[in-house]
Amino acid sequence: MHNPTPRTESPSALAFIKRFFAAEAAGGLILMAAALAALIVANSPLADSYFAALHTVLAGMSVEHWINDGLMAIFFMLVGLEIKREMLAGQLASWSQRALPGFAALGGMVVPALIYVAFNWGQPDTIGGWAIPAATDIAFALGVLSLLGKRVPLSLKIFLSALAILDDLGAVLIIALFYTSDLSIPMLLAALGSIAVLVALNRLSVKKLLPYLIVGALLWFFMLQSGIHATLAGVALALCIPLGKPDEEASSPLLHLEEKLHPWVAFAVVPVFGFANAGVSLSGITVDKLLDPVPLGVALGLLIGKQVGIFALAALAIRAGLARLPDGSNWGQLYGVAALCGIGFTMSLFIGALAFPGAPELVDEVKVGVLIGSVLSALLGVVVLRRFGARG
């Protein structure tokens, strides 16, 4: 009897897999697939099992809370590492480099929030969601941008990355200042003590990551119990991890941790979050429902507010001589990138869950608004960039 030899991947197939996971678009594409899968499952016979699994309690918290409070702390730690690296040695290391993405990020947070507030003014139950459309999903946006290939100059990708870093910094500050529940003073003091230990480790030039990670885990627990959102522990930990000197890049604790975390966050943490949070039943969604203040404010905040706010303030900074267009780009491409920034998936859904705790119907409305606004923003951005990329 013939025994077939075990199947092995061909060199070309392995090369393709490596290229796929190395591509900028890969993380965004996997997140898109996870979100689509969640929508399909939530509107299939498996819906009851899907929602029951998310609400299963493990060690005192539901699976959904473990994902949003636990796994997302790892996401926020990577965000913190990227912010610190870019501020100290990257695309945001000088004021001149910060000018264009800084003005753009400011406009991209303020105008969407104002649009949401305009639709929800006088609605005490929903006005608290004003920050939902103020966020940009860097994985989605860069994923879509990368699919356009050489139509988009590298300088625009760098601009989008820098803008998203500042956008994330703004979102972190918003969460810390506006979405903090009743505080437990003893746990808050314990959290502050943990941060003091992390700062001391940094000042003592401790290079090993293990002490930071142990204290960081304690910080996460104390923040979880204190009333401050536990994910902010990831940011605080990241900001205390040393970058090192420019000539010590190979031994940099920050760069080493960022390199190790990035694939886990891109290909595991964020897709799991997307699958757990994008699932919404569309059976009760009508045109009237879509015109409710929350989904309308979120969708238009992302679709209109992002592109108007980013492009207007970026143009103002350029015209005033405070910044200049990214090298090799044109005004049309800048507008296309501004439109892409209306993709607000991960952070928008995250803030939506914080804004409306205990109100699942409002969270579902947020999901619908985020999905509509993000998809339309992606389509608009692609159309504009294809139109102006050929000429740019």
Swiss-Prot record:
Catalytic activity line of the entry = Na(+)(in) + 2 H(+)(out) = Na(+)(out) + 2 H(+)(in)
Chief place where the protein resides:
membrane
The biological process GO terms on file are: regulation of pH
Q: GO molecular function: any one?
A: sodium:proton antiporter activity
| UniProt keyword Transmembrane, yes or no | yes
- Supply one GO CC term from the record: plasma membrane
Q: Where found, per UniProt? A: Cell inner membrane
Supply the Pfam families for this chain.
Answer: Na_H_antiport_1
InterPro entries attached here?
Na/H_antiporter_dom_sf, NhaA
Query: What membrane topology is annotated for this entry?
Result: Multi-pass membrane protein
Give TM segment ranges: 20-40, 63-83, 99-119, 127-147, 158-178, 181-201, 209-229, 265-285, 298-318, 336-356, 365-385
Domain of life of the native organism: Bacteria
Entry keyword set: Antiport, Cell inner membrane, Cell membrane, Ion transport, Membrane, Sodium, Sodium transport, Transmembrane, Transmembrane helix, Transport
State the HAMAP family in the record: NhaA (MF_01844)
The protein's role, per its UniProt record: Na(+)/H(+) antiporter that extrudes sodium in exchange for external protons.
UniProt cross-references to PANTHER family, sorted A to Z: NA(+)_H(+) ANTIPORTER NHAA, SODIUM ION/PROTON ANTIPORTER NHAA-RELATED
Family as reported in the entry's similarity comment = Belongs to the NhaA Na(+)/H(+) (TC 2.A.33) antiporter family.
Q: What is this protein called?
A: Na(+)/H(+) antiporter NhaA 2
